[in-house]
Regions:
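Acidic, proline/glycine-enriched N-terminal capping motif
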Residues: 1-70
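Acidic, low-complexity central loop/insert segments
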Residues: 21, 29, 74-118
Length: 118
């Protein structure tokens, strides 16, 4: 997950900065469910998400193995065992979750197109 090296996104941003154009950068929405959803999210993000009550959210970040920030997100606690993660790189978040979940009871999927986000 080398988010900061996304060459396509960087090229798009530079084109907009140097000219005129339309730039749509919608966050992805990832749904995380399962008995161990909180446990896995606690491994991935730096904030204590156990303190986020249902119906509330937390701005947080994830770090790589060197302690460098690789992404910042908003984690929304929708219900017991149900979280939504607002993330710019949803397709890259899914393998990151898989890498850290081990044998945990968790399922993650992109639900961006089920909801309009602006």
């Amino acid at each position: 997950m080398l988010f900061k090296e996304d060459k396509v996104a960087r090229a798009d941003a530079e084109a907009i900065r140097k000219g005129i154009g339309f730039y749509r950068w919608t966050h992805d929405l990832v749904e995380v469910t399962g008995r161990d959803a909180l446990e896995v999210l606690q491994k991935i993000y730096i904030s204590d998400l156990s303190k986020v009550p249902v119906g509330k959210s937390k701005y947080t970040a994830s770090l790589d193995e060197n302690g460098e920030i690789i992404d910042d997100v908003i984690v929304m606690h929708m219900a017991d065992g149900l979280y939504w993660v607002s993330d710019l790189y949803g397709p890259r978040l899914l393998p990151w979750i898989d890498r850290h979940k081990g044998d945990a009871d968790i399922h993650a999927k992109i639900i961006t197109y089920d909801w309009d986000m602006y």
